[in-house]
């Protein structure tokens, strides 16, 4: 009997929570219907990892890192993160892909501000262990790719000056994560933002990210 219990524990499914914004939710550049599960990058990640893993999607359009949104409301990632972690425990890994919505005019924050904000999310995750529900998960931060040309985008009016800031984020966030012992992968190394709206991704980019993140996950777990 003890042998079979040990075998079951050895084959335990690994649970992964993907916490992000509209690009995790599956918002298409043409503002059409949401991408299906198989197209969205967490779904691609699930397919790449296989049956030994369970990938949970928590993407919310408009979600930012730590800010109360005075226009849309309900988009503060820090307020939502720990309740979501607890609701999905036990968790082995949390993947955070946020920062793009922080570039909105209404927040007026810099790439360094965003890096510190992501640091707060990581700290909250690392402190989320519960005596009954489970231990705190490992954390992987994904830096969002730079925005594309916004001149003809429906989002141009709320992202004034965001293109240049978004191009700076990978280096600033990378330095911050290295200094604070946080795992980070630059999604911009494999993903190109669509020229259609300058913010969201075509299906092929979701596929590229899912494949790349699978390699990161396997190295961690």
Residue ranges and their predicted role:
Residues 4-60, 66-71, 83-88, 94, ...:
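Serine-esterase "nucleophile elbow" of acetyl-processing enzymes
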